[in-house]
Amino acid sequence: MGGGSIVPPLGLATNASYIPDRYDVMIVDENVKQAIYSDADLVAVTTNTITARRAYSLCKEFREKGIPIVLGGIHPSVMPEEAGRYADAVVIGNGENVWEELLGDFERGRLKKVYRPETFDLTQSAVPRRDLLKGRYFYDSLQTSRGCPFDCEFCSVTRLYGGEYKYKPLDRIRKELESLRTRNVLLVDDNILGVGKEAERRALKLFELLGEYGLHWIGQASINIADNSEALRLAQESGAKAFYIGFESLNEDFLRAANKRQNLKKGVSSYKDVIKKIHDHGIAVLASFIYGTDFDTRDSLLRLVDFISESTIDAASVKPLTPFPGTRLYERLKQEGRLFNDHYWLEDPYPLFTFNPKKLSLQELTEATLNFLDIYNPLNSTGYFMRSYQSTQSMRASFIAFLVNISDNRTYRKYIRRHEHTLARRFGIDQWRRQKHREVDIVIHQK
């Protein structure tokens, strides 16, 4: 926090658009600067699980100053009792249609402990208050739909949106497009194409609309987008430069257990073909993978390292499987008594691992983490750029992938260094192995 951010906090800007004009509203993005302790009458904080401990600390500081606190976001929505210990009011779910009631209660001095607004109608969505975003961002952000048609065990989107997949009308999206402050845009929709003929027709119309504004955009998609050549063509023509795609694993047993059915339908053997089809339309592939599952072995993780290195993926994000509260994965591991800490997000620092996989020792899991450091080596980022350009023939798409690699590089290494002493104590490691390149030289001695 206090460092920088690539995209602005769209949720805060969206909620601000529903606050009456009689209020002076300030948005503070802690990814850009620390919170300002001013003479605010009311403070609303949004948080996910990773930032929950910091959010609770903020709540304590504001409440000590006598300023009422409202907590919202995905973590308070799935852990309202916990969040309620730190806030005067907790908003569960979408916040757009809660502000009239909440502010009325605030003015009467009778804030409720919990607000559960009805499902918000996206056809009534307002244009986010981007004028309140004071940070400098490389990308603007835009949401055209909510929810995801899939229900993966490790994902909390279905819990938050109730399995619904809803769209904003195109005329509403047009108004938002006209309010953007840059042509570089991140579409934060969980799945830009969706599933089924209706969803696909809607996506094609969306791409045509985006094409009117000369954008360079990044979106999130499932591997099924590779089967729709028309969608890829229109996406390319509308300015798509990269897709985040959750490949997740090379192990189909894990994909089956996690209900990642969209990947199972095509099969792991299709991954390289999916990548090629997207590349053929000048779009980079920003792939995400998960490790530390109950189906992983030391050998399978080495194969994953080889696959990422040998495939034509433009950028790879490899993270340990984390059971976020609100997911079926969290509930299952908690019931099985396998979580190291049921409230691990309150630990300082935020833990690297939260449970022990069935087929990996903690020593092997740690070694795998170090192996993935090679993927994030700065020298490899340069190689990825050259490979990306050869695959996409798009300088901008390759540059975007390069920036993602550099950002992940910094984040991943900082994360590892933050945990070096904790890892040494927990896993009894005598010494981290040296990495191929000298700038990665972390040595830890057993205590």
Task: Go through each PLM region and give its residues.
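Radical SAM [4Fe-4S] cluster-binding motif and immediate context
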Residues: 126-286, 291-293, 299, 306
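Structural detector of well-ordered beta-strand residues that form the stable sheet scaffold
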Residues: 70-71, 91, 113-115, 218, ...
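Structural recognition of alpha->loop->beta junctions
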Residues: 82-101, 234-243, 303-318
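Short, electropositive alpha-helical surface patch
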Residues: 41-44, 49, 202-208, 296-313, ...
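Radical SAM enzyme core and accessory elements
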Residues: 21-27, 106, 338, 351-447
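Flexible glycine/acidic-rich beta-alpha junction loops that bind and position SAM and/or redox cofactors
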Residues: 82, 196-197, 253-258, 291-299, ...
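A structural motif corresponding to the C-terminal end of an alpha-helix
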Residues: 18-26, 213, 274-285, 311, ...
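Acidic, low-complexity intrinsically disordered segments
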Residues: 1-184
